[in-house]
């Protein structure tokens, strides 16, 4: 019985660890995305990155972040295709995950 409990505890710990890595990776991705977008928008990188990170708490998934960028690009007259924004989001998530793994 102890073996089953140990395995269950190990699975719970792995799940918690994986969720923490996912959260950290998404937050890092949003920061990197904010820096990228700020460069295109002519805004302060750190301040805008914070806005992007905060925008991600509006709803689950990436749509809130995408909408923030799309709205801000449109308002500033910056031409970036939806596909390019989504591709950058995917690319920066991979980069962020690699950075987080490297730090762990």
Spell out what each predicted region is:
Residues 1-104:
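A charge-rich, low-complexity, intrinsically flexible signal that marks solvent-exposed coils, linkers
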């Amino acid at each position: 019985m102890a073996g089953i409990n140990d395995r269950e505890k190990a699975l719970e710990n792995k799940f918690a660890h994986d969720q923490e890595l996912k959260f950290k990776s998404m937050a890092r991705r949003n920061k990197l995305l904010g820096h990228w977008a700020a460069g295109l928008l002519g805004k302060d990188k750190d301040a805008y990155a914070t806005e992007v990170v905060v925008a991600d708490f509006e709803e689950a998934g990436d749509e809130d972040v995408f909408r923030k960028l799309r709205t801000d690009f449109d308002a500033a007259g910056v031409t970036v295709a939806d596909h390019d924004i989504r591709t950058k989001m995917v690319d920066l998530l991979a980069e962020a995950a690699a950075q987080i793994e490297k730090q762990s």
